[in-house]
From Swiss-Prot:
Residues 17-26 have a biased composition (Pro residues). The gene is ASCL1. The keyword Calcium does not apply. Transcription factor that plays a key role in neuronal differentiation: acts as a pioneer transcription factor, accessing closed chromatin to allow other factors to bind and activate neural pathways. Directly binds the E box motif (5'-CANNTG-3') on promoters and promotes transcription of neuronal genes. The combination of three transcription factors, ASCL1, POU3F2/BRN2 and MYT1L, is sufficient to reprogram fibroblasts and other somatic cells into induced neuronal (iN) cells in vitro. This is Achaete-scute homolog 1. Residues 81-90 have a biased composition (Basic residues). The lineage of its organism: Eukaryota, Metazoa, Chordata, Craniata, Vertebrata. The modification N6-acetyllysine is found at K156. It is linked to Genetic variations in ASCL1 may play a role in disorders of the neurocristopathy spectrum manifesting with features of Hirschsprung disease, congenital central hypoventilation syndrome, dysautonomia, in addition to neurodevelopmental issues. One of its GO terms (cellular component) is RNA polymerase II transcription regulator complex. It comes from Homo sapiens (Human). It is found in: Nucleus.
Length: 236
């Protein structure tokens, strides 16, 4: 009895010690589900960032081709008028003008007009003045040759040929007149044979010459005024 009581008292005096709790581990299914969700979220974020980058690149490529609308509102014909305004803006920039000077447009079938140097411009101006003076000279010469004033369409070659023939006729007439005057002054020719020469002058000039036939005792040469009155159109 005493031993049993001692055992009970000894058992009552000793209290049971608590055992340490093991850490809680999630199941394998929950772990894999969490990893899959994290991977899906990362993939979605990467896809969204890639899409945003692609949209930004497209906007940057389309920005030079689109016309900015006035006050932030696009007009009805924005797509048609956008290239025109962009072209105007580009052509007004000095950088583009310098690039156009360096480009070669011969392959497209046209070329940009180039400014002439000052020396070339002066040479062209002198050539134009020379041609103008030549034309004025021919117009003046055409007025002095026979039938030149009536025929205004006479070419330059015809005008020169007519002037040469006219000068030769005048020179021949002057030579004949000087020879006859010298012969009469020297006494080689007598007044009796002078009517033949007067008839020749009458046939050429178409006007009578009385100084050789009216008076047989004296001879009066032609004066310069009478010489100018001779008509030389019969030579042509």
């Amino acid at each position: 009895m005493e031993s049993s009581a001692k055992m009970e008292s000894g058992g009552a005096g000793q209290q049971p010690q608590p055992q340490p709790q093991q850490p809680f581990l999630p199941p394998a299914a929950c772990f894999f589900a969490t990893a899959a969700a994290a991977a899906a979220a990362a993939a979605a974020a990467a896809a969204q960032s890639a899409q945003q980058q692609q949209q930004q690149q497209q906007q940057q490529q389309q920005a030079p081709q689109l016309r900015p609308a006035a006050d932030g509102q696009p007009s009805g014909g924005g797509h048609k008028s956008a290239p025109k305004q962009v072209k105007r803006q580009r052509s007004s920039s000095p950088e583009l003008m310098r690039c156009k000077r360096r480009l070669n447009f011969s392959g497209f079938g046209y070329s940009l007009p180039q400014q002439q140097p000052a020396a070339v411009a002066r040479r062209n101006e002198r050539e134009r003045n020379r041609v103008k003076l030549v034309n004025l000279g021919f117009a003046t010469l055409r007025e002095h040759v026979p039938n030149g004033a009536a025929n205004k369409k006479m070419s330059k070659v015809e005008t020169l040929r007519s002037a040469v023939e006219y000068i030769r006729a005048l020179q021949q007439l002057l030579d004949e007149h000087d020879a006859v005057s010298a012969a009469f002054q020297a006494g080689v020719l007598s007044p009796t044979i002078s009517p033949n020469y007067s008839n020749d002058l009458n046939s050429m000039a178409g006007s009578p010459v009385s100084s050789y036939s009216s008076d047989e005792g004296s001879y009066d040469p032609l004066s310069p005024e009478e010489q100018e009155l001779l008509d030389f159109t019969n030579w042509f």
